[in-house]
Design a protein with these regions (language model features):
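Conserved short submotifs of the Hanks-type protein kinase catalytic core
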Residues: 91-104
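C-terminal intrinsically disordered, low-complexity extensions immediately downstream
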Residues: 314-383
Length: 384
């Protein structure tokens, strides 16, 4: 049995501060085990009734992590339950207890004062490729790879987490298309493919790699159609002639098919932009991970053996990655809270200025009314 029984019940763990994450089936807190003093992450699994039972996403996560043991994959330490509320007929909530990491990749990128340097990017991508390679060797697809599911420890070690959408595979099978967060979803899933394999994870890893190189998400759109259009534009695939026949036969092709002419300049080609900043070798690896045809897409072994990692400057050591203060929580939820606070502060300042203009002499004669120039609140930027 892999699990360490650090506590007998969830009540033996002491939660510290506000939640640090919100998952598919519960909320995540930083906590300590009073018996060992170890900091851990507690993910609550809400059990609404005995009939519903343990959520399938939680079952998948436990099953996957019991099969996996790797330095770059988060460790599941315990599964325990909290006592039900007094007088309640509902079962108590269950908790998954994980090793704690003070940051995820979203938080690292948001709070750093400078972009990642090439040796840091190489170090992170190599660790990510190692984690994925091990998963695929164990016949597990992650199917939800994104920056917020990539944890960073205080020592700069990368830990792949959140296996709630993972599943076993033994080659292309009849799987769900409603997996992988939209910005990191490969074109075959956007087009409705149900027979796919581990290379869907490689596309997502390529999106993360490109995000580290560019300093921003590659395909940030709000719908499947718009993400597909963004892929067409940014990958130089605005003509139907550039798409493989296998993808043209998928259910959503007629709805999503690009309308550009063959040879048309997309104008926002990511490879052209990144070639100037990072060179041909980095762009070659990115192209390999973002191949539109999954049959031609590089696999994790191909990533690890790519000349990108042998080219100077070499990858730094994890401990050399400049991370945020490990005493602080720097996760996606913290980034969202920070952006929401900034939005509220801007809105309060705008209303204050509007009221001052309205109260100024001559405002009434000019037709000004308190709040007359108020518009809709700015939309909060979405984090991958």
């Amino acid at each position: 049995e892999k699990l360490e029984r650090e506590g007998t019940t969830a009540d033996s763990y002491e939660k510290l501060g506000a939640p640090i994450g919100e998952g598919t089936y519960g909320t995540v807190w930083r906590a300590t085990c009073p018996r060992t003093g170890r900091q851990v992450a507690m993910k609550k699994v809400v059990l609404r009734s005995e009939r519903e039972g343990f959520p399938v996403t939680a079952v998948r996560e436990v099953r996957a992590l019991r099969r996996l043991s790797h330095p770059n994959i988060v460790e599941l330490l315990d599964v325990c339950a909290a006592a039900p509320a007094s007088g309640s007929s509902s079962p108590g909530d269950a908790y998954l207890i994980f090793e704690y990491a003070p940051s995820d990749l979203t938080g690292l990128l948001a709070y750093r004062k400078q972009k990642l340097k090439p040796p840091e990017i190489k170090c992170l991508i190599k660790q990510l490729a190692n984690a994925l390679d091990y998963c695929h060797l164990k016949n597990i697809m992650h199917r939800d790879l994104k920056p917020s599911n990539v944890l960073i420890t205080a020592k700069g070690e990368l830990k792949l987490c959140d296996f709630g959408l993972s599943r076993l595979f033994s080659g292309p099978g009849n799987y769900s298309t409603r997996v992988i967060t939209l910005w990191y979803r490969p074109p075959e899933l956007l087009l409705g493919a149900r027979h796919y394999d581990h290379r869907v994870d490689v596309w997502s890893a390529g999106c993360i790699f490109g995000e580290l190189l560019a300093g921003h998400p590659l395909f940030p759109e709000s719908s499947e159609v718009r993400v597909f259009q963004k892929i067409c534009e940014r990958c130089g695939a605005t003509s139907q002639e550039t798409w493989p026949q296998e993808l043209k036969s998928l259910p959503q092709w007629d709805k999503f098919a690009p309308r550009g002419a063959d040879g048309e300049n997309p104008g926002t080609d990511i490879y052209r932009d990144l070639l100037l900043k990072h060179g041909e070798v980095a762009v070659d690896l990115l192209r390999g991970t973002l191949q539109l045809d999954p049959e031609l897409r590089i696999d994790t072994q191909g990533v690890l053996q790519h000349r990108f990692f042998a080219q100077e400057p070499l990858a730094c050591q994890p401990s050399e990655i400049k991370i945020n203060d490990p005493r602080l929580s720097c996760h996606e939820l913290d980034v969202k809270r920070h952006r929401e606070k900034l939005r509220e502060d801007r809105e309060a300042l705008r209303q204050q200025q509007s009221q001052k203009r309205s109260a100024a002499p001559g405002a009434a004669q000019a037709g000004g009314q308190p709040g007359a120039d108020e518009g809709a609140s700015p939309k909060r930027p979405r984090v991958g």
